[in-house]
Amino acid sequence: MRYMQDSSMPCQDASPPDVGAAPRRATRAVRVQWGGRTVTVGGNASVVVQSMTNTDTADAVATAIQVKELAQAGSEIVRITVNTPEAAREVATIREQLDRMGVEVPLVGDFHYNGHKLLTQFPECAQALSKYRINPGNMGGGKQRDDNFAQMIEVACRHDKPVRIGVNWGSLDHELMARKMDENSRRAQPWEAQAVIRDALVVSAISNARRAEELGLRSDAIVLSCKVSHVQDLIAVYRDLSARCDYPLHLGLTEAGMSSKGIVASTAALAVLLQEGIGDTIRISLTPEPGGDRTREVIVAQEILQTMGLRAFTPMVVACPGCGRTSSTFFQELADSIQSFLRRQMPLWRTRYPGVESMNVAVMGCVVNGPGESRHADIGISLPGTGEVPAAPVFIDGERTVTLKGDHIAEEFQAIVEDYVARRYGAGITH
C-alpha cells in the first residue's frame, strides 16, 4: 500500500514555488510619439493598453470626443479608422482638437485596401498620425500588393512613423494561403487545415516585416500582430510568432464578442500569453452593447494587467460574492460605490498621491472571511451578516481602528479611505 507524504513534514532543501509571470521576452523597443509624449512598446517597457474608436472618423468632433474619453479612461494609444478621403482629410483636424484639449495620446491610423492612396494623397493625415496599422492581406495581389505595401512603407519612412503589420485570419493573403496548402499536401503526414492557417499567419507577419526592413523601415519601428477569434488558436499563433522573431507583439482576440463572453474569451487568451512573458501591448476587442460605454474595453484591459500583477492603474476593491450569511445587498452596493469613488478620484490622486494605484481595499459581507480579508488589505471594512451585531469594524494596515454603526456607514467609510490615502500616499507632497 502506498501512503502519501504528510504535508506537515518539512521537506529538506525545498524552495517555495515560483510566483508571478515569466520574464518578458526580449523585444525591440518601438517608440510611438506625439508632442511631448512618448509611449514605448516593447523593450523593457510595461505592457501598453490600447483602444479603438467606433465613430465615423469623418466626424472630427465626435471622434475627438471619444478619443479623449478613451485616453482619460487610461488608453495609452488610440486607433482610428482611416477608410475614406473624407476620413483622411479630418485626421489632422482631430489631432488639432485633441492638442487644444491637452490630450497628447498618440493616434494610430487603421488602413485597409486604400491606405497607400490615402497616405499619399493626404500628407497632413500621414503626419498627424503617430503610427500606421497595415494589413498586408487586403492590399491586392501579386505585384499590385507589393507596390501598395511598398508605397505605405515609403510614407512611413518619410514621416518617421512606426508601423504595425497586423495580419488577420479573416483577410489572410490568398496566394500565401494557397502555397501553404499546396506545401502541406506534399507532407508525408499533412497538418490539419487549422494548423496550416496558423503557420500562414506567422509567416505572413514575419515575411512582411522583413520586406518592410528591406524597403528602409527601421527594425525598431515595427510591431506585429496575428489576430484570430478562437482562444486556443491565438495562444498557439503567438507562441510560434514569439519564438521566431524579436519584434514587439500586439495582443488581441479579434471579434471576441459582447459582454461577459468577450471579456472571458479575451482574458482567457491574453492571460496565458502574458503569464508566459509574451505580449507588449494589448487591446480588448469588445462588441459594445447598444448604448454601452466604449471605455469598457480600456477598463477590462487594465483589470487584466492589474489582477495579474503586471501593472497597477487604480486601487483594487476585494469583495465577497455574498451567500446565505449576508442579510442584504448593502455590502455589494458599498463595494460598487467605493470602486466608482476610487476611479473618480484617480485623475487627481494619480499626480497628488504617487503609489495609490497599488492600494487594496476590502469590502466584506460577514464575519466568516471579513476580518481576515480586511486585515490583508491596506484598508478594509467587515459588514455585519445575518444574526451578527449591527456593527462594521474598519481595519487599516492590518489593525482594527474603528467600528462604524448606523445609517451612514458608506459615507463614513469613504471619508476614512480618503483620509488614509492623504496620510499614507501624501507624505512629503507639497499641496
UniProtKB/Swiss-Prot annotation:
Q: What class of enzyme is it?
A: oxidoreductase
SUPFAM superfamilies, alphabetized: Nitrite and sulphite reductase 4Fe-4S domain-like (SSF56014)
In what pathway does it function?
Isoprenoid biosynthesis; isopentenyl diphosphate biosynthesis via DXP pathway; isopentenyl diphosphate from 1-deoxy-D-xylulose 5-phosphate: step 5/6
Q: Which cofactor does it need?
A: [4Fe-4S] cluster
Q: Where do the record's region annotations for Disordered lie?
A: 1-24
- Detail which positions bind [4Fe-4S] cluster: 320, 323, 366, 373
Q: Give the source's domain of life in one word.
A: Bacteria
Matching entries from Pfam families are given as: GcpE
For this protein, the Enzyme Commission number is 1.17.7.3
One of the GO biological process terms = terpenoid biosynthetic process
Bias kind Polar residues: ranges: 1-10
Cite the InterPro entries for this sequence. Dihydropteroate_synth-like_sf, IspG_bac, IspG_bac-typ, NO2/SO3_Rdtase_4Fe4S_sf
Keywords noted in UniProt: 4Fe-4S, Iron, Iron-sulfur, Isoprene biosynthesis, Metal-binding, Oxidoreductase
**Is Disulfide bond included in the keywords of this UniProt record?**
no
Keyword flag 4Fe-4S: yes
**Coiled coil ranges:** none
Q: How is the cofactor bound?
A: Binds 1 [4Fe-4S] cluster.
Single GO molecular-function term? Answer: 4 iron, 4 sulfur cluster binding
Q: Which Gene3D superfamilies match?
A: Dihydropteroate synthase-like (3.20.20.20), Sulfite Reductase Hemoprotein, domain 1 (3.30.413.10)
Reaction catalysed?
(2E)-4-hydroxy-3-methylbut-2-enyl diphosphate + oxidized [flavodoxin] + H2O + 2 H(+) = 2-C-methyl-D-erythritol 2,4-cyclic diphosphate + reduced [flavodoxin]
Its family remark reads: Belongs to the IspG family.
Q: Which purpose does this protein serve, as stated in its record? A: Converts 2C-methyl-D-erythritol 2,4-cyclodiphosphate (ME-2,4cPP) into 1-hydroxy-2-methyl-2-(E)-butenyl 4-diphosphate.
The protein's name is 4-hydroxy-3-methylbut-2-en-1-yl diphosphate synthase (flavodoxin)
Q: Which organism is it from?
A: Bordetella pertussis (strain Tohama I / ATCC BAA-589 / NCTC 13251)
